Amino acid sequence: MVKAAVLYEVGSQLVIEDVELDDPQAGEVLVKVGAAGICRSDRHFMHGDAPIALPVVLGHEGAGTVEAVGPGVTSVKPGDQVFLSFVPSCGRCKSCITGNSHLCDNHGATGPNMYDGTTRLHKGDQRIHHMGKTACFAEHAVVPET
């Protein structure tokens, strides 16, 4: 269980509560969140100015410490300090391998779930979405390696 700030409905306050966080899967990393920025984007989602799947843990700018890695993760290890961003990069396309990860051919996959279409956050049977695959308005976050 981790504490997280969950948005259940547009126009409402964030609810700070315990939620379940699954272990990282292949290509994923568990991060203990040390800091999270509050961005105008978070407010847009909260106020309904932009659509988002609910319920959701917001927060797409953060920093923390890697606590665990899933199978196949090679770029970070437990104890590493990392920055969390909602602009994911695949690390494999031409843009990524030439140092232009901000132009990633696959970055359009910034939806509310992990790359496999599931979530790592839930409360009982109710899944909770990850804003931009980061969801750093929580004590811990499971994020893609890249």
Question: Where are the regions that the model predicts?
Answer:
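Glycine-rich beta-strand-centered segment in the early N-terminal region that forms part
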Residues: 22-36, 46-97, 102, 110
